[in-house]
Amino acid sequence: MRVRVAARGSRLSLLQVEQALEELSRYAGVSMHWEVVRVKSAGDVWSDRPLESIGVVGVFTREVDRAVASGAADIAVHSLKDMPTSGYGGPLKIVYIASRPSARDALISRQGPGRVEDLEPGSTLGTSSARRRALSLHYNPRIRVENLRGNLDTRLRKLREGLYDAIIASEAGLIRLGVDVEYTPLDPSYFPPAPGQGFVAVVARVGSNVEKMLRDLDKPPWWHVAWAERGVLEGARAGCRTPVAAYAEPLGRSMVRVTAAALSPDGSRAYWARAEGRIEEARRIGVSLGEELSRVVEGWHKTGGGS
């Protein structure tokens, strides 16, 4: 089967295409040959601006999805964490989610191994993620967190040049890129990741050959885990412009545990919620936790502590 794959042109994006399509071929039992249609996203065009200032829903996905919707590509491949919760009920649909090598964040520091609270007072930590910023300030309010955009190679170069004392990156990205650098993995129970972090999603048009081929196949075991984390984002969406984190893990074959967190942007307030249930109910559990986060954040706003 030949497919045209819309994706961003970064080295990590192309590696994710390769992983997702090779895994999808095995899953569906179909030999797939692909041609990459490279697309520049809004996030790529405005690479010098903080993500929250761009003001675009799906800053890394919108233009890529348009290539599929217009027929210029058959499927799109995204980092699941970059995908908004709306827009995939038709005409576009998430048809497959590739497994993740890790959900964890990684702290890379010029000061050596350690957790965020071990960074020296006045240290400068670079990140473009509102979640990583809030969590870092929650654990260590004595550091400075500054915006840092760019691919992983660029961020590591700026760290080596001394522009930052530490950065936080996705461990999955480090693994996929084969980066040889010393880092401290941050346990998800302590530093929960972005919902869907590490997973790679495949999007297709409803009714397309790819969507029909995958429609009735059993879902891979990590499918429900991924949807539990997205469920947190769905549930929190209505009242939450606040940083949200989520981590789901299977408990044996039939159960799942979901951890969710919301923080004020400055890290001064944080709320954790956890729940367990049957794995088929994973998405519902995630949505319920997200709604709980939303209610808590609404209370912060009423008392002037959510900003």
Curated annotation (Swiss-Prot):
Pathway: Porphyrin-containing compound metabolism; protoporphyrin-IX biosynthesis; coproporphyrinogen-III from 5-aminolevulinate: step 2/4
Note on how the cofactor is bound: Binds 1 dipyrromethane group covalently.
Keywords: Porphyrin biosynthesis, Transferase
Sites of S-(dipyrrolylmethanemethyl)cysteine modification: C240
Catalytic activity: 4 porphobilinogen + H2O = hydroxymethylbilane + 4 NH4(+)
UniProt record, GO biological process: protoporphyrinogen IX biosynthetic process
Pfam families: Porphobil_deam, Porphobil_deamC
Cofactor(s) annotated in UniProt: dipyrromethane
Gene Ontology MF annotations: hydroxymethylbilane synthase activity
EC number of the protein: 2.5.1.61
Cellular component annotations (GO), alphabetically ordered: cytoplasm
HAMAP family recorded: Porphobil_deam
NCBIfam families noted in UniProt: hemC
Purpose: Tetrapolymerization of the monopyrrole PBG into the hydroxymethylbilane pre-uroporphyrinogen in several discrete steps.
Other remarks in the entry: The porphobilinogen subunits are added to the dipyrromethane group.
Family per similarity comment: Belongs to the HMBS family.
PANTHER family per UniProt: PORPHOBILINOGEN DEAMINASE (PTHR11557:SF0)
Name of the protein in question: Probable porphobilinogen deaminase
Organism: Aeropyrum pernix (strain ATCC 700893 / DSM 11879 / JCM 9820 / NBRC 100138 / K1)
Organism lineage: Archaea, Thermoproteota, Thermoprotei, Desulfurococcales, Desulfurococcaceae
Gene coding for it: hemC
